[in-house]
């Protein structure tokens, strides 16, 4: 086997260094820390650690997901009666954000025609006292608002970072334009407790803290160093064999 030239080895090393730099640069941005896609028909996260559960007396089944998976969506029903218990019923996700800052949440949600048009996103660090992070509301229309999927993104408050027990709820709420009343997601429909919300692709992302970033970078550098040593040793052995053959 013809050994690689010194320039070829340098080019290989250069590409590896560029790749390492790209990896390190990516670590400066948000990375996925927990994900639920429900494709397995269970509430276990598909990435990272965490817990998904129902709150406020809701019930659930699995139904078609955002991309059409047969059981890829978490379908929620049994919401409060009209005019009662706003901001209490829906779903909750528990996870740790220790070692991370700039926590973000994204998810897809499908509103049935008779479901509440308004969602509140709440967060807590003790699972008891919840604070509103944001709210989303659909303006009902006769077509296109009910039985439709929506993409949601939330930047959680700074205090949600570096928490051992972060809880986030997505719950139904009264419509802001109708005093003390839920409003159906489709114009012409009436709000019903049997209306459903369906969740898919619930993702939590965050930025590693400097200590976490340093540890990941050190591991990457260590791996690169070991690779260089092994490549160097292999090339020395190949060169020696080739040179000996040349003198015969």
PLM regions: where:
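Surface-exposed, low-complexity/disordered Ser/Thr/Gly/Pro/Asn-rich loops and linkers
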Residues: 53-99
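Conserved Ser/Thr-centered positions that define the repeating blades of beta-propeller domains
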Residues: 121-124
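C-terminal membrane-anchoring or membrane-association module
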Residues: 225-248
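A short, hydrophobic C-terminal helix/tail in secreted or cell-surface proteins
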Residues: 209-227
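Extended extracellular/luminal ectodomain segments enriched in beta-structured repeat modules
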Residues: 97-106, 163
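Terminal, low-complexity interaction segments
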Residues: 35-38, 130, 134-206
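Extracellular carbohydrate-recognition regions
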Residues: 29-56
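Extended, low-complexity, turn-rich repeat/linker tracts enriched in Gly/Pro/Ser/Thr and Asp/Glu
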Residues: 99-101, 110-117
């Amino acid at each position: 086997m013809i050994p690689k030239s010194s320039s070829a080895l340098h080019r290989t090393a250069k590409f590896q260094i560029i790749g390492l730099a790209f990896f390190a640069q990516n670590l400066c941005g948000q990375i996925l820390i927990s994900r639920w896609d429900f494709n397995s028909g269970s509430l276990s996260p598909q990435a990272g650690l965490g817990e998904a559960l129902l709150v406020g007396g809701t019930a659930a089944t699995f139904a078609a997901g955002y991309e059409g998976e047969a059981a890829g969506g978490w379908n929620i029903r049994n919401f409060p009666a009209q005019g009662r218990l706003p901001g209490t019923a829906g779903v909750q996700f528990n996870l740790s954000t220790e070692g991370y800052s700039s926590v973000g949440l994204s998810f897809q949600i499908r509103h049935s025609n008779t479901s509440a048009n308004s969602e509140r996103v709440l967060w807590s660090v003790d699972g008891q006292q919840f604070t509103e992070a944001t709210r989303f509301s659909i303006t009902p229309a006769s077509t296109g608002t009910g039985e439709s999927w929506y993409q949601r993104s939330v930047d959680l408050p700074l205090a949600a970072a570096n928490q051992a027990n972060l809880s986030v709820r997505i719950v139904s709420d009264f419509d802001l334009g109708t005093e003390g009343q839920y409003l159906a997601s489709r114009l012409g429909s009436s709000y019903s407790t049997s209306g459903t919300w369906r969740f898919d692709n619930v993702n939590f992302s965050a930025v590693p803290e400097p200590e976490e970033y340093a540890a990941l970078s050190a591991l990457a550098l260590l791996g690169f160093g070991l690779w260089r040593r092994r490549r160097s040793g292999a090339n020395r052995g190949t060169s020696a064999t080739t040179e000996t053959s040349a003198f015969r």
